[in-house]
Amino acid sequence: MEGEKLRVTVKPGEYVYLDLSKRYFPLPGEVSSAGLGEPIITPEKVHLPVHCGDVDQGGKPGVAWDFNLLSLDGYSPETGWIRIDTSKLASIHIASLEKRRSVQRKASKSKKAGRVLAKYSKRERNRAGKHQLEIARVVQSVCGSVGLEELEKQGMYTRSRIWNRRISRGDWRSITRILVGRLGEAGVKELDPYGSSSYCSKCGWFNRDLNGADVFVCGGCGLRLDRQLNAAINLYMRMRFGYTEKWVGGRKRVELRMEGASRVAWWDRVVLPSLVGGCVLTGAERSDPDELVRGLHDAVRPKLHYAYDRYADAYLRIPT
């Protein structure tokens, strides 16, 4: 974009300029080359895909979500940190596994055992499906557009039997399919999950020694933040700015398209106020009235926290 004109490269060194000053639609205030798709030119019309931000027609903000084994963590500057406790969904799979294990060895030799095994499997699908629908309802109620990790289980299996069982019980793809069915493909953007937990959301430093730690510690800027929250912020930035995938020294690297803007300055201006509410927090489980919080990890808690209520048989917001 050059002012009100769109420059289209015909071949190296030769351009065609399209005047957009008389268009009937507004362009986003921060539109750039990264926010424009490839023009489709026909003899009658020019089709120009434009990224219109992360707020849908209903006014709800776009939220990026990080899938975990026992929780679903989301983030946007408008909502802050959102956490949905999915431990009840995981417990359904665990309980069903224990029941199936008792009859699975007999299923190949006994028709009755086979019918019992099929009954247990169907019951598990029905119960898990109900929770998946409830979780998707909560996601849909708090945000407009959705950014989700494009996870593939086949690439996550290891030699550990316990870990493989945990991964096989994941309901990520099922929840994604439900959201796509409700919001449409335009409302759900699948993001590359590579390094979302390992990159520092503030400065981009890569932590090679995370090793399942609950707290992300940055060796570049000193940031200490909940691991899941750091991943959700990284995914939100990929959804908002876009990203490119590169291979450097035989390693994959995901880089944001921030058009030369300072990542640290944007984080301090946009992300930090959304985490601490615009004020300086001075305590979290203090042993002394004058003891200061040691970092963001000690002060920041989810602003919206949802969990399963067995009396209401639904996922409800709980105090944070």
Locate predicted features.
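Acidic carboxylate diad motif detector
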Residues: M1-I41, T86, R169, R173
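Positively charged, helix-rich recognition surfaces that bind polyanionic ligands
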Residues: E44-T320
